[in-house]
Amino acid sequence: MEIRTATMNDLDAVAAVEAECFPVAEAATREEFAERIRYYGDHFWLMFEGDKLIAFLDGFVTDEPDLTDEMYAKASMHDENGAWQMLFGLNTLPEYRKNGYAGELLHRAVEDARKQGRKGAVLTCKQIGRAHV
């Protein structure tokens, strides 16, 4: 499995995976992802099996220690020099779940945050399923 950051070339695949993983009322739109990738594409962790995007995690960097609803909607709040790595969405296509891929992405994001000198990473989620630890 390859893990890499996002470019605008990944936009359609990212939006498609999000649409498959979240209900319409909760899923970020293609336009929101375009804005996110434009501001902080280096803070997307995309996992591929061959050429197929199977999972991803994204979030921006800020000096604010608490994740707020406003952060989901305003990619422009990203501050590359911020102390905290926010993590907004963790998506794995249904047929690839229960293989540890989400955990791999989280581990990579936390490791990258550590290497970049961040104070920590913040992930907030709504329980849709159960976490397997």
Give the location of each predicted region.
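Glycine-rich phosphate/pyrophosphate-binding loop shared by adenosine-nucleotide-utilizing enzymes
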Residues: 1, 52-56, 85
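A short beta-loop-alpha structural element at the N-terminal edge
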Residues: 1-14
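Helix-loop element at the rim of GNAT/NAT acetyltransferase active sites that forms part
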Residues: 16-30, 36
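Conserved beta-hairpin
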Residues: 43-57
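Conserved acyl-donor/pantetheine-binding loop and adjacent beta-alpha core of acyl/acetyltransferases
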Residues: 57-90, 97
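Conserved acetyl-CoA-binding loop-helix of GNAT-fold acetyltransferases
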Residues: 92, 98-111
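Conserved GNAT acetyl-CoA-binding A-motif
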Residues: 106, 113-126
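Conserved small/polar residues in nucleotide/adenosyl-binding loops
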Residues: 127, 131-133
